[in-house]
Amino acid sequence: MKPDYKLVAKAKYIHAAADLASELWHEVYKRYYPAKQLDTLVDALQSADVIEEDIDNDVNYFLVFLGDKLIGYFAWKMENTALHLLHLYLRPEYRGKALGRDILASCERLARGEGRGRVSCEVYAKCLPVMQFFKARGYRVLAPAETVVEGIPMQLTTLEKML
């Protein structure tokens, strides 16, 4: 069964995206941040208000469904010469089943179709399986991209693939 991608535009989908983001961020980042810091990061970066503001600033959020099951989400924004992939998260039981690969390939096709020469993303530097996922698909490490959110440092790495 192939997944369906639903564009997040209505309030109910914004809240569904925020709820799923909170669930997945807590699952992915619990080994790197204490619970309180993680709550702060989720609220600052993936709350319903933040997602709505992102959408108002031309970020495209999609919910990923397999049949009637909500299994993940991703978000991207077109920039001058690149599609910037902001988020790509799947529930644990759906990882390793080529779904992330297919989402990434769709983003790359879209970027090519829009005349963009590359896809870029920032990955949490300590998430080695995620780094490996992108490297295995031809992405190269550009540079560290440390940022501070609500006083909490986030060690990110910028990756890029030329199309």
Language-model features and meaning:
Residues 120-124, 131, 135, 140-156:
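Conserved catalytic-core motifs of GNAT/GCN5-like acyltransferases
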Residues 90, 124-125:
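Short amphipathic helical patch at the helix-1/turn junction of helix-turn-helix
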Residues 98:
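Conserved G/P- and acidic residue-centered "switch" motifs that form tight phosphate/ATP-binding loops
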Residues 101:
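Residues forming the Rossmann-fold NAD(P)(H) cofactor-binding site
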Residues 111-123:
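Conserved GNAT acetyl-CoA-binding A-motif
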